[in-house]
Amino acid sequence: MKKNIINVLVFISFSLFCCVSICGVACSSKIELSSKDLISVMDRYLDLLVKNDPVGLPVANNIKITENGYPIQLGSGLFQTAEEITYKQYMADPSVGQVMVFGVVKESVLLANFMVRLKVDKDKITEIETIVARKDESSFASPEDLKEPRPIYARVLSESERSPRDVLIKIANSYFEGIEQNTGEMVPFHKDCNRYENGTQTTNNPSTIATGCKEQFDDKVYSYITKIRNRRFLLADEEKGLVFGIVTFDMPGKRENFEYFPTPFDELPTRFYKPRSLLLAEMFKIVDGQILSIEAVMVNVPFGATSGW
């Protein structure tokens, strides 16, 4: 009898151990960091970035890191030159464990626009993707104009204004299709749509391009962009109507491609005369199925360059 009781107790103990172990594995595999948690990880990253010291970052052994499309080692690149972050605009997506920030960084005496994307798996950073748009390498760069995040991106939409994740991505992709095909007819632009590139408003702005989002497409302003590739839509936020992606524009630099550009070809900066590509990170605000605002950080790269991903 005593032996039977001992056997029963052993069986129960073993069963409980197995249940706890299995539950532990199951629970750990379902850990999902909240938006607040992901932004905290980004803040920790940026804090160490300006200290030029990656020690203390919770990174995975197989971490992948790129800067402006090129693979780099942890602690190199912007990690060696960043001194201060003067502007931050976040977006997080707990469903994919990713967070990004558009920001302005001070390097020595110069300011630069930048984007950092982190992917976090449980408690480890597995991906770090950075784009740094310094003034001598970028178009429309005016980091000094960015002081506070635009409130439009933080606004939570009503249920009737929202679109599902797949629709948000489809709408954002239609924007790139419209550029390739030189038409705004396929792109659902909001009548009040505006675009900001490296801190500069590039729509409805007489000092850059005076026409609006749809008008620029219909006027074939971007006919010098012949291909948009490596399209990756990485984060989405249905509540706020946000979608974020990274793409590459190809620009062969041929004179005939600038026929409809508002500035005469011979008056354009010399960078327009040569083949180049553009690595872009873009965030879209989509309300009622229409693109209301676009925010981008972009940098010139060699023609045909990849994003590194």
List the model feature ranges, each with a label.
Residues V10-S21:
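Bacterial N-terminal signal peptides
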Residues C23-W309:
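C-terminal and inter-domain tail/linker signature
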